[in-house]
Structure formats: C-alpha cells, structure tokens
C-alpha cells in the first residue's frame, strides 16, 4: 500500500528534516487491512531517526501531536483503529512549541 506521510510543527526534525515521505508498506501477517496502530509502529521503526519518545508514547502519538487522515482528525475516525486505504495521506503536526 502506498501512503504519503507528512510531518510538521518540528516533527520533521525527527525524520532527518524531511517533511514529506512517499512510502510503500506491505500488509502485516497477510492481512488485508492496515490500521493506524500498524502504521505508527512502522513509522517508529523505519522513519524516526532520533528521539522517538518525542513522537510516540507507548503505542500511540504523544499528547500534542495532531493526526489527520485525508484531512480528517483521526479522533473522528477511530484513532489507532482507523483503517487505512491505499494512497491515503496522513499528516502529523506537533502543536507544542518552545518559546
């Protein structure tokens, strides 16, 4: 499955300062669905280059990270249980900024 992953609000610094990633992810365990929980695990293993604790806490994103799936807040679509489809666009934006 192909996805576009976008990181903003400083989260791109955890991914070698690359904001937009076009990725191909194989389905896990020959399943025909991929959930946000699966995607977050893949992102932690394959994209986050440093300080993963700044992006994730446990199996989910840290408080203060806004997640959009096709421009829709993931809280409206089931959060970790959100089912992803080919060519979805997932955006991660940190709402916490130093000052």
From Swiss-Prot:
Covalent link Glycyl lysine isopeptide (Gly-Lys) (interchain with K-? in acceptor proteins), residues: 99
InterPro entries recorded: Beta-grasp_dom_sf, Mopterin_synth/thiamin_S_b, Urm1
Pathway field: tRNA modification; 5-methoxycarbonylmethyl-2-thiouridine-tRNA biosynthesis
1-thioglycine found at: 99
Gene Ontology biological-process entries: protein urmylation; tRNA thio-modification; tRNA wobble uridine modification
Keyword Cytoplasm among UniProt keywords: yes
Maturation and modification: C-terminal thiocarboxylation occurs in 2 steps, it is first acyl-adenylated (-COAMP) via the hesA/moeB/thiF part of the MOCS3 homolog, then thiocarboxylated (-COSH) via the rhodanese domain of the MOCS3 homolog.
Transmembrane regions: none
Classification via Pfam families: Urm1 (PF09138)
Keywords recorded for this protein, A-Z: Cytoplasm, Isopeptide bond, tRNA processing, Ubl conjugation pathway
Family the entry assigns: Belongs to the URM1 family.
Function: Acts as a sulfur carrier required for 2-thiolation of mcm(5)S(2)U at tRNA wobble positions of cytosolic tRNA(Lys), tRNA(Glu) and tRNA(Gln). Serves as sulfur donor in tRNA 2-thiolation reaction by being thiocarboxylated (-COSH) at its C-terminus by MOCS3. The sulfur is then transferred to tRNA to form 2-thiolation of mcm(5)S(2)U. Also acts as a ubiquitin-like protein (UBL) that is covalently conjugated via an isopeptide bond to lysine residues of target proteins.
Protein's name according to its UniProt entry: Ubiquitin-related modifier 1 homolog 2
């Amino acid at each position: 499955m192909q996805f576009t992953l976008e990181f903003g609000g400083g989260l791109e610094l955890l991914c070698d300062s690359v904001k937009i990633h076009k990725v191909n992810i194989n389905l896990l365990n020959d399943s025909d669905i991929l959930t946000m929980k699966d995607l977050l695990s893949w992102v932690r293993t394959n994209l986050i280059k440093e300080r993963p604790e700044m992006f994730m806490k446990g199996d989910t994103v840290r408080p203060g990270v806004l997640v959009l799936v096709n421009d829709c807040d993931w809280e409206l679509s089931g959060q970790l249980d959100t089912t992803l489809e080919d060519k979805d666009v997932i955006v991660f934006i940190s709402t916490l900024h130093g000052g």
